[in-house]
Amino acid sequence: RKRLFYRYYSHPGNYMYLGHYGRYYNMLHNCNAMLLAHQMQAMRRYQHRMRVKQMYRRIKMKQMYRHMKWMGMYRQAKAARLRCI
């Protein structure tokens, strides 16, 4: 279900929200739920970092292959020049 995150505001349906841990902050709700929320958040952050790393790796690979292609052309041209002479 949809969770609304209010920062400086609380109402009964929101379980006194303060901080960024969702509605599990006040410790009367359930300590396990609080820990679970924190764990899930950490997991999501980790997954996101992995995704970002993968993205940059892809970019790097693309650049590398482009460079290799360019080098290939360069070497062929050099070989042709040597053949000319």
Curated annotation (Swiss-Prot):
The keyword Secreted applies. Keywords: Secreted, Toxin. It comes from the Eukaryota. Its main location: secreted. Expressed by the venom duct. One of its GO terms (cellular component) is extracellular region. GO terms for molecular function: toxin activity. It is found in: Secreted. Is lethal to drosophila larvae. Belongs to the turripeptide family. Turritoxin PaIAb was only sequenced until Met-61. This is Turripeptide PaIAa.
